[in-house]
């Protein structure tokens, strides 16, 4: 079970539109209680997304996870979806909401793509994962939201081999990997980079 979080109190509400911190915290505590009652062995991963405004919240988030028995993960906050990363990399306009996200990011798209381009020859993580939407349609990739990238309308009518072949041989995937965009979210999640940039005080634990 995975939980997404971007800070404590008002900082959480800043990057989770319409969300309320008190409700989020109460739900985390309920989840911990239900897990203890029904399935104590269930893994709960708590993902803390590092922005420029929430870095000081990390110690409280860590204490919360320790108290509830959640496994704490952390990563630099990404600009999603990859459509937006590609637009920034191409110098194209992005939405006002995406601009706001960029202003809050601790690790910029430019920094990420500089590293990702150097890793462009490394494999694409997403080729091993199939994105099936609620309507059974299959997209090229779980990280690209462009509706024109739907490969098949019904997951139940095609084989895994057909899906894999359509993605690997597609122009979209070739171009994405040639530019290194497929590595962008791996860079955002690089914990060694987080330590190197002192993004959060995790070094104190080592």
Regions found by a protein language model. Give the residues of each.
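Conserved core architecture of multi-subunit DNA-directed RNA polymerases
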Residues: 178-179
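Iron-sulfur (Fe-S) cluster-binding modules
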Residues: 204-206
